[in-house]
Amino acid sequence: MAAAPRGIWEQRRLGCGLGPLARLLILAQALRLLPAARAGLCPAPCACRLPLLDCSRRKLPAPSWRALSGPLPSDISSLDLSHNRLSNWNNTLESQTLQEVKMNYNELTEIPYFGEPTPNITLLSLVHNLIPEINAEAFELYSALESLDLSSNIISEIKTSSFPRMSLKYLNLSNNRISTLEAGCFDNLSDSLLVVKLNRNRISMIPPKVFKLPHLQFLELKRNRIKIVEGLTFQGLDSLRSLKMQRNGISKLKDGAFFGLNNMEELELEHNNLTGVNKGWLYGLRMLQQLYMSQNAIEKISPDAWEFCQRLSELDLSYNQLTRLDESAFVGLSLLERLNLGDNRVTHIADGVFRFLSNLQTLDLRNNDISWAIEDASEAFSGLKSLTKLILQGNRIKSVTQKAFIGLESLEYLDLNNNAIMSIQENAFSQTHLKGLVLNTSSLLCDCHLKWLLQWLVDNNFHHSVNVSCAHPEWLAGQSILNVDLKDFVCDDFLKPQIRTHPESTIALRGVNVTLTCTAVSSSDSPMSTIWRKDSEILYDVDIENFVRYRQQDGEALEYTSVLRLFSVNFTDEGKYQCIVTNHFGSNYSQKAKLTVNEMPSFLKTPMDLTIRTGAMARLECAAEGHPTPQISWQKDGGTDFPAARERRMHVMPEDDVFFIANVKIEDMGIYSCMAQNIAGGLSANASLTVLETPSFIRPLEDKTVTRGETAVLQCIAGGSPAPRLNWTKDDGPLLVTERHFFAAANQLLIIVDAGLEDAGKYTCLMSNTLGTERGHIYLNVISSPNCDSSQSSIGHEDDGWTTVGIVIIVVVCCVVGTSLIWVIVIYHMRRKNEDYSITNTEELNLPADIPSYLSSQGTLSEPQEGYSNSEAGSHQQLMPPANGYTHRGTDGGAGTRVICSDCYDNANIYSRTREYCPYTYIAEEDVLDQALSSLMVQMPKETFLSHPPQDAANLESLIPSAEREPAAFPTNHERMTENLPFSQRSSEIFQRPLWNMNRELGLLPFSQQPVLESPELTERDPNCSSPVTCRRLHDHAFDFSRTRIIQDGTEGT
């Protein structure tokens, strides 16, 4: 039998002097070790503590370890050879159960080999040795290895060949000299690796996608030399849950630095040099729950920083350089439960900054400078309805107002330690449910306002946990408030400053000077000082004047006045201003005065005059600046009634400062005004929109059939912009104008009095403007009597000519004489009145570049000149300049050129003695054609006029029988009008009309029936005539002029 282990014999020897119970325990231990002793497998240098074979700290020479070469106890699964100064290992072990080997704190330079147990080993710890590299061959025999700890060696790099393919789960390479990580160095471990520790190395850069470890859950890179983390650095770590990068000196995290870490819950970045928090580097961290960033240099939190990590439950930003918490600092963190902002430099907390933290339970604001949040009753903590713990120690708080903790209904623990609190208003803690209060101050002002605190501390059982004593009045100085009698809390004076004059809110224009005044009084001689704040931030380098004087108010009082002067205010000066008056006994805060800086609007873009075709898109630009930003609105012709708006053709693009009118129509033409308005004032800019339209027929052209001797009225109602010029031709040739031909409404009506057979034929109405020309045909059929057959005329019409039909109507001699007299009166009146008829003045018309002018060979409009001008059809117009100090008015209301001889004399001799005055004007926007025609009829030489009863002015439609006024298809030529109806059939219908319908069509006006003879001076020399032939003038006559009133009004309207 093998000898028993030395330990067992020693226990037996020591047990001889022990009691029965001790000997029994020793015997049990000996029996437990007996199987191992019997097997002879526990070597002398080691201790068997099943399942551990502890051979650590023996410090034996190498030959002493040969005893381990034999079989090991069967129950041994762990072997510890740490702290033995082993430099190599050449011994092979015999064990089927060995799984863990520790050889820490030795001097090994290579990976040891243990012989038979090596393939079964799952844990190998070689901490603090001298291994310089990782050799894949050494690990090929460790087929079952799951945990490898090589920390504190001298490994300098990890190569792609460092590890063989193995099922390693835990790898610790911390505290080495690793500076290089080759791409793909961990690829052979990608199927199993869960934990990697690379702390305390010399890694300065992490190559992108170096960690292709889809199962890795924990990665530590603490205490390296990483300064910049590039985007996509950690891509491939799909399962990572925790990343620790403390103490690296990281100064920049680029956008997408942690992209791909979709399952990460914990990120530790303490003790680095980060200066801000923004959503760029937080992108992709949607499952993040804990973020630790203390001990950095963070100065700012971007408004949308937490957009991609809204599951945060704990955020540590302590020991940074935050000076302000803006309103949007914590937007999106509705699940946050713990927030640590301690040991920063916070002096400004925006109103409502915590309103998004509805689930916050712990808020640590220790060692900042936010005394005003408690003293100014700003309700800075509103919205924290779940907060249970609030730490405010070390914030220089001097007073606690009644509204300081409004909104903290769930607050249970409040720490106000290390604040020299002097006053606490009554009911300051009434909104809370405090169970713990930490308060330590010896600066209390024990006056009547503090009497309530004593009883409140006792009632809530806080008198044992607080240390509060009085500093004033002097006879109570140093006494605990718990020992002061209630009758000693009196108010004999007002030591703390009291604000008497608050600064007032002001609205000022940009560039003016603004003055804000604040006045406080105190009964103490303690010096007072004032600081001004803008939006809760202290103002430096501003112009402040302070005045102090004594005044009598319930005794002597010190009055302190502070004046803040702001010169040439700008928009950056807008905000809420407040003065804070402080003396030895505390501070008082004035009301906040709002300064608003306005600026009158000024145009950046003004609309330009625009000329455009119908159907196109009109685009008017208008933009203005001012403060506040002016509102842009549009008017048309001084009103807001837009035809385009009613028809949903108007579009306003606020972002582009553009006003669109789609599918422009004639009714859109006018003056458009861009109005820029804000509370400081308004201004407007005008632009003229001119709409160009090709000539068109407003009413369809209709053929005419009249009885010989009747009056024929041919209508050519034209539309277009600018208003088109009209010319008439007959049978594709010039129209020979006689004393029976009259033109009205700018040649839109051709009136033939006492129609004869020679007047029958094809009349062409040719209208043209700057955009084009349009023509239409009217066929006039003159029949000899209403009962005559018109078949012959039909045949002549088909040959494109007119055949004289009918017989000469014998007119009574008296009617002929009457007709002659009326004709003389008409000529006399027209010459005397010398009505102003003009062509539309196109001098100032702005045309698109693609429209050449028909008045000038150079493509531009020609200046109107004195003399004669030829139209496109070959007719003539005599253009007269202003004379006798009078200016002729055009259709647009401005000055225009007077037309003496119009196109009615096509191809005629313009110097002929038979040349007659022919009115020429354009129709205005109102349709005055009906009125103009009725007025003009009084000038027609027809003896039957004298016997017609007086009547009012008739409309133009009265000249046309009702059957002819029916709307018809718009005819462009005569062939279209007569395509389906033979001329013989139509002529037969026309011939049925009685001869006396002429009077019914004319609709005559009343006039004087006294005969008027032509004066001998009617014919005289006209100096403006270019021909030596005498020109005929019309002079005034003595009969009733009321008959011409309608046509005069119509002329002025054009």
Curated annotation (Swiss-Prot):
Residues 40-74 form the LRRNT domain. Disulfide bonds join 518-579, 622-674, 716-765. The keyword Signal applies. The chain crosses the membrane at residues 807-827. GO terms for cellular component: cytoplasm; growth cone; intracellular vesicle; membrane; plasma membrane. Its main location: membrane. Residues 442-493 form the LRRCT domain. The modification Phosphotyrosine is found at residue 905. One of its GO terms (biological process) is negative regulation of axon regeneration. PROSITE patterns: IG_LIKE, LRR. Keywords: Cell membrane, Cytoplasm, Disulfide bond, Glycoprotein, Immunoglobulin domain, Leucine-rich repeat, Membrane, Phosphoprotein, Repeat, Signal, Transmembrane, Transmembrane helix. The keyword Cell membrane applies. It holds the Pfam family LRR_8. GO terms for molecular function: signaling receptor binding. LRR repeats lie at residues 75-96, 97-118, 120-141, 144-165, 167-188, 192-213, 215-236, 239-260, 263-284, 287-308, 311-332, 335-356, 359-381, 386-407, 410-431. Residues 497-596, 601-690, 695-784 form the Ig-like C2-type domain. This is Leucine-rich repeats and immunoglobulin-like domains protein 2. It comes from Mus musculus. The gene is Lrig2.
